[in-house]
């Protein structure tokens, strides 16, 4: 099965991806990591789409998406999970990632992008701040075991 974990920077996507990986066993591919699959971007996209399509009914694969243009790579049958966080939490996490400094232009960029995924269609919505990751991952595992 393919799990698309979708959300803004610092919303909790990678943490959730690791939890799901541990619960069901899966490969994680983040953002444009698929570019390593080939020398050219166009060839890498083709190979990655094939990998995703074969994973829909095969081995588990988690694709972590933080840019809207990456959504087109997800197969129609993928499980789509939106991970969200409030803007203050996102800024604080980003500040930590940047060693305690959040320049004003970066803060403005985060504010501008906030909510960019909210209107999409998702199978699940997970709160990356207050969500119970253990319970969520266990629920996915139970559904995976029934497949």
Q: Which functions belong to the PLM regions below?
A:
Residues 17-57:
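Conserved substrate/cofactor phosphate-moiety recognition/catalytic segment
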Residues 5:
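Hydrophobic anchor at the beta1->P-loop junction of P-loop NTPases
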Residues 76-96:
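Conserved phosphate-donor/acceptor-positioning beta-strand/loop module used by diverse small-molecule
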Residues 99-147:
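Small-molecule kinase domains that catalyze NTP-dependent phosphoryl transfer to phosphate-bearing small molecules
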Residues 57-63:
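Loop/turn-to-beta-strand initiation segments
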Residues 9:
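The conserved Walker
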Residues 1-2:
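Pre-Walker A (Motif I) flank of P-loop NTPase domains
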Residues 14:
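Walker A/P-loop
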């Amino acid at each position: 099965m393919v799990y698309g974990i979708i959300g803004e920077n610092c919303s909790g996507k990678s943490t959730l991806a690791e939890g799901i990986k541990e619960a069901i066993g899966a490969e994680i591919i983040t953002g444009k990591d698929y570019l390593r699959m080939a020398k050219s971007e166009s060839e890498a996209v083709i190979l990655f789409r094939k990998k995703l399509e074969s994973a829909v009914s095969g081995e588990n694969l988690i694709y972590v998406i933080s840019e809207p243009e990456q959504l087109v790579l997800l197969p129609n049958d993928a499980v789509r999970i939106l991970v969200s966080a409030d803007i203050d939490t996102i800024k604080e996490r980003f500040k930590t990632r940047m060693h305690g400094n959040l320049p004003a232009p970066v803060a403005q960029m985060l504010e501008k992008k906030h909510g960019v995924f909210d209107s999409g269609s998702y199978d699940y919505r997970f709160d990356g701040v207050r969500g119970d990751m253990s319970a969520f991952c266990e629920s996915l595992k139970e559904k995976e075991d029934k497949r």
